[in-house]
């Protein structure tokens, strides 16, 4: 590996009442969405031709069965905790879990749970732990969860063994797409005036892959600290778009440039020209 690759799954579970629930899951390797799992399906859907990685059919079936058991146990546990703690529906639960592979074939895993949008607990090592500032009832939840040795062992196995093994194969199978390099195009313009005697300079960068990029307004060799970066937006072809602005006095615009650094450029930064 030349760089780290995080593999993370997002689970969203909605409990409307004691009989009406739904759980949907999505997974990403880096910035590429690789899997989805609808509440209405018993099977995980592949979003890439290489989404099975190097696992054979039997290995993948075993993982899918373990995750299916996990999904059922989460639903059961939530309903049990509602009764035990006298909680009220509706309940929203989010789980963010996975592992990150680093150069040297090392990995680290993570498993975080949010209740009603608030981070409440995490799985670390072999045990569940409360997050800082959580409601008092979460301590009781953690105590009960830590008594369930079977589920804890299953999560340890998934996080520490299955996930790194699967993700290593996923990276190998998807290497050509993961290592794809697409050069950015960049152009300058001016935006709506921020005020009397002011200019908003806009540097647009588009069509680049992978996502990490550095875009900075410059005066000579000096980075301009008031450079403001917008959100990364996806293009239809899987590349990215970014807008970076600088608010300056009209008389100070001369001599400013926009510098774009990206891995596809081989160290040759680009400086688009206003025009």
UniProtKB/Swiss-Prot annotation:
Function: Antigen-presenting protein that binds self and non-self glycolipids and presents them to T-cell receptors on natural killer T-cells.
SMART domains referenced in this protein's UniProt entry, alphabetically: IGc1
Entry keyword annotation includes Membrane: yes
Pfam family, one: MHC_I_3
The UniProt record lists the keyword Cell inner membrane: no
Protein name: Antigen-presenting glycoprotein CD1d
Ig-like domain ranges (all copies): 164-274
Annotated Gene Ontology cellular component terms: basolateral plasma membrane; endoplasmic reticulum membrane; endosome membrane; external side of plasma membrane; extracellular space; lysosomal membrane; lysosome
Quaternary state and interactors: Heterodimer with B2M (beta-2-microglobulin). Interacts with MHC II and CD74.
Gene: CD1D
Primary localisation category: membrane
Residues of this chain annotated as glycosylated in UniProt: 17, 39, 105, 160
GO terms classed as biological process: antigen processing and presentation, endogenous lipid antigen via MHC class Ib; antigen processing and presentation, exogenous lipid antigen via MHC class Ib; innate immune response; positive regulation of T cell mediated cytotoxicity
Residues that coordinate or bind a D-galactosylceramide: 77, 148-151
Species of the source: Sylvilagus floridanus (Cottontail rabbit)
UniProt KW keywords: Cell membrane, Disulfide bond, Endoplasmic reticulum, Endosome, Glycoprotein, Immunity, Immunoglobulin domain, Innate immunity, Lysosome, Membrane
CDD domains on file: IgC1_CD1
Other noteworthy facts: During protein synthesis and maturation, CD1 family members bind endogenous lipids that are replaced by lipid or glycolipid antigens when the proteins are internalized and pass through endosomes, before trafficking back to the cell surface.
Cysteine pairings via disulfide bonds: 99-163, 203-258
Subcellular location: Cell membrane; Basolateral cell membrane; Endosome membrane; Lysosome membrane
């Amino acid at each position: 590996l030349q760089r780290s690759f995080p593999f993370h799954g997002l689970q969203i579970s909605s409990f409307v009442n004691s009989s009406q629930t739904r759980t949907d899951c999505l997974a990403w390797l880096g910035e590429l969405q690789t899997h989805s799992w609808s509440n209405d399906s018993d099977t995980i859907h592949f979003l890439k031709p290489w989404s099975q990685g190097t696992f054979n059919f039997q290995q993948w079936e075993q993982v899918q069965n373990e995750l299916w058991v996990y999904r059922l146990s989460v639903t059961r546990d939530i309903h049990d905790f509602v009764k035990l703690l006298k909680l009220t529906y509706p309940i929203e639960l989010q789980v963010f879990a996975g592992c990150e592979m680093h150069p040297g074939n090392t990995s680290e895993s993570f498993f975080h749970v949010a209740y009603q949008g608030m981070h409440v607990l995490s799985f670390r090592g072999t045990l569940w732990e409360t997050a800082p500032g959580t409601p008092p009832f979460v301590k009781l939840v953690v105590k009960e969860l830590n008594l369930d040795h079977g589920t804890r062992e299953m999560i340890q196995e998934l996080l520490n063994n299955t996930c790194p093994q699967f993700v290593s194969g996923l990276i190998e199978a998807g290497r050509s797409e993961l290592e794809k390099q697409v050069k950015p195009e960049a152009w300058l313009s001016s935006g709506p005036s921020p005020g009397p005697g002011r200019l908003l300079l806009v540097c647009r960068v588009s069509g680049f892959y992978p996502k990490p990029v550095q875009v900075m307004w410059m005066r000579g060799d000096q980075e301009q600290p008031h450079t403001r970066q917008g959100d990364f937006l996806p293009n239809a072809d899987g590349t990215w778009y970014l807008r970076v602005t600088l608010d300056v006095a009209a008389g100070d615009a001369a001599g400013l440039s926009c510098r774009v650094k990206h891995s596809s450029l081989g160290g040759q930064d680009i400086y688009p020209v206003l025009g």
